[in-house]
């Protein structure tokens, strides 16, 4: 299938992945997990929501936990260059027959919300309330010391169409998994805006669903430390996969599940992709190193389970990729 070309002059300027809004069924339990075990910092909270961020982040929040009756991913947030980009985004959406709304969101500037053609619920904002970063507040460090939100990974029922849509928005392909043969289909794609391996990864599967969101950590030892913390604080069963190293992205990783089953990746050691002539790296779906350069094979849950988007029907994928699943 066609590999999208880099678009260097997109209709509006998305800078990076910014924040995720999660619907959770037990706000206290979710807060305790993300604050005390993982180590994110609570910036604000009330009876209906908790706002957290990593120690490197100047923005008010990078994850919002919202009290709800059903667990789901409510929104994926991206930061744009300035308020003018929001108006350009609105014009682009209108020209392409997509509805949008400007919504008031706590601690954020103007926020544009829309649902893309594939059911992913997105919001764009240029500004948030500012907070001092906490990098040098070692007395506040807990868990694995998360630094910053790095990326989102989603299950998409129509991978090629989703990849093509986000390529039009300036997301540049860094790596991809493809079937062998002259008519091989793309089954997964890693796309970036900020100059590392990805801000947004698109994976073949029942969708739209969130596979995971990820925080960047300073070292692999922080990931190993989190394993110790989770094992000694009642969360051993929440460690789903890893630690290990991906072939795709070269990242050292750990996947854990929160009390509602939302999947969080702790992530470090990928690489720079910001050069304009950076060539995407192709992986054959028959090459097991793409998922696991070393470490235990991924369990079935990692391939099959994800968080639905609030109010969106989940559809079967257009094709079923041949992947290796651990027994």
Give the label of every model feature segment.
Residues 1-10, 16-25, 66-157, 176, 187-191, ...:
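Vicinal oxygen chelate
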Residues 40-74, 120-128, 176-211, 217-220, ...:
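Conserved short beta-strand elements that form part of the metal-binding/catalytic scaffold
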Residues 57-59, 79-80, 143-144:
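Non-heme Fe(II)-dependent double-stranded beta-helix
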Residues 12-15, 21-59, 103, 113, ...:
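Core segments of cupin and vicinal oxygen chelate
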Residues 30-35, 93, 119, 162-166, ...:
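Conserved active-site tyrosine of GNAT-family acetyltransferases
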Residues 38, 94-97, 170, 231:
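Residue-level detector of secondary-structure transition/capping positions
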């Amino acid at each position: 299938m066609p590999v999208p070309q880099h678009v260097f002059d997109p209709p509006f300027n998305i800078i990076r992945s910014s924040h995720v809004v999660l619907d959770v069924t037990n706000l206290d339990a979710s807060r305790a997990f993300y604050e005390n075990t993982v180590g994110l910092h609570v910036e604000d909270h009330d009876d209906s929501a908790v706002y957290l961020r990593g120690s490197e982040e100047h923005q008010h929040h990078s994850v919002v936990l919202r009290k709800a009756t059903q667990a789901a991913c409510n929104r994926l947030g991206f930061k744009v260059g300035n308020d003018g980009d929001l108006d350009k985004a609105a014009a682009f959406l209108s020209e392409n027959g997509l509805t949008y709304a400007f919504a008031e969101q706590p601690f954020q500037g103007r926020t544009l919300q829309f649902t893309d053609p594939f059911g992913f619920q997105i919001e764009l904002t240029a500004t948030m309330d500012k907070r001092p970063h906490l990098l040098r507040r070692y007395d506040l460090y807990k868990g694995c010391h998360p630094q910053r939100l790095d990326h989102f990974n989603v299950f998409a029922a129509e991978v090629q169409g989703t990849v093509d849509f986000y390529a039009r928005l300036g997301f540049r392909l860094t790596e991809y998994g493809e079937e062998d043969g002259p008519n091989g289909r793309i089954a997964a794609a890693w796309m970036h805006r900020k100059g590392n391996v990805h801000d947004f990864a698109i994976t073949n599967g029942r969708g739209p669903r969130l596979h995971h969101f990820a925080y960047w950590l300073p070292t692999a030892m922080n990931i190993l430390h989190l394993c110790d913390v989770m094992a000694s604080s009642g969360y051993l069963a929440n460690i789903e996969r890893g630690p290990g190293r991906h072939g795709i992205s070269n990242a050292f990783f750990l996947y854990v599940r929160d009390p509602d089953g939302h999947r969080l990746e702790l992530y470090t050691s990928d690489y720079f992709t910001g050069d304009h002539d950076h060539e995407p790296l192709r992986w054959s779906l028959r090459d097991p190193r793409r998922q696991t350069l070393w470490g235990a094979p991924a369990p079935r849950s990692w391939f099959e389970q994800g968080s639905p988007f609030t109010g969106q029907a989940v559809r079967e994928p257009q094709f079923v990729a041949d992947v290796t699943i651990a027994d």
